């Protein structure tokens, strides 16, 4: 169930990164050009109006409709950012996927080690009788996660003393 959630989260993150790369381009504002209402620029020659041409329309200026003539202008207050290329989007996506895979591998290794240690501790506890004087200290060391460290060391020292019945009295000083 956890892997299904992780897969959904990964898909959501990758989708977000791809959408951000696709729509993260700087915005351009289109504004219509101003129409010529009698004021012509200084570079265009003015036609002199003669009495013969007064009744005919002036064809020296080609006036196009405003709706078809559009110019792309960028606002002065906004900064121009370079548009993300497909290489940068792929690099970011690849980095995210690789980091997600590394995190998953670390979590799986930790879970496998914890489960294997629990299985070994349970197997050792079932196979060995804790009442036997010759039992090893391995089964006691598995229960250190419960916070019984002091009693475990005393039990293991007791087992050492019972194994070495005529042995050394200095075993108690080692604690």
UniProtKB/Swiss-Prot annotation:
Topology in the lipid bilayer: Single-pass type I membrane protein
Name of the gene: ECSCR
GO biological process terms held by the UniProt record: angiogenesis; apoptotic process; cell differentiation; chemotaxis; negative regulation of angiogenesis; positive regulation of endothelial cell apoptotic process; positive regulation of proteasomal protein catabolic process
UniProt keyword terms in alphabetical order: Angiogenesis, Apoptosis, Cell membrane, Chemotaxis, Cytoplasm, Developmental protein, Differentiation, Glycoprotein, Membrane, Phosphoprotein, Signal, Transmembrane, Transmembrane helix
Pfam families linked: ECSCR
Recorded family membership: Belongs to the ECSCR family.
Protein name in the entry: Endothelial cell-specific chemotaxis regulator
Self-association state and partner proteins as the record states: Interacts with FLNA. Interacts with the 20S proteasome subunit PSMA7.
Summary of the function given for this chain in its UniProt record: Regulates endothelial chemotaxis and tube formation. Has a role in angiogenesis and apoptosis via modulation of the actin cytoskeleton and facilitation of proteasomal degradation of the apoptosis inhibitors BIRC3/IAP1 and BIRC2/IAP2.
Topology feature Cytoplasmic, residues: 113-175
GO cellular component terms, A-Z: cytosol; plasma membrane
Location relative to the cell: Cell membrane; Cytoplasm
Region (Disordered): 33-66, 124-145
Chain ranges passing through the membrane: 92-112
Biased composition (Polar residues): 133-145
């Amino acid at each position: 169930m956890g892997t299904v959630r992780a897969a959904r989260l990964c898909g959501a993150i990758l989708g977000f990164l791809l959408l951000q790369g696709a729509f993260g381009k700087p915005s351009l504002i289109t504004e219509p050009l101003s129409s010529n209402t009698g004021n012509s620029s200084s570079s265009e020659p003015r036609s002199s109006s003669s009495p013969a041409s007064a009744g005919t329309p002036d064809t020296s200026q080609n006036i196009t409709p405003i709706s078809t003539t559009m110019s792309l202008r960028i606002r002065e207050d906004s900064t121009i950012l370079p548009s993300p290329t497909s290489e940068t989007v792929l690099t970011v996506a690849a980095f995210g996927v690789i980091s997600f895979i590394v995190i998953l591998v670390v979590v799986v290794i930790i879970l496998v080690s914890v489960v294997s240690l629990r299985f070994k501790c349970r197997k050792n506890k079932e196979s060995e009788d804790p009442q036997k004087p010759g039992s090893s200290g391995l089964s006691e060391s598995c229960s250190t996660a419960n916070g019984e460290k002091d009693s475990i060391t005393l039990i293991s020292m007791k087992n050492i003393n019972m194994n070495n019945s005529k042995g050394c009295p200095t075993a108690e000083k080692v604690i």
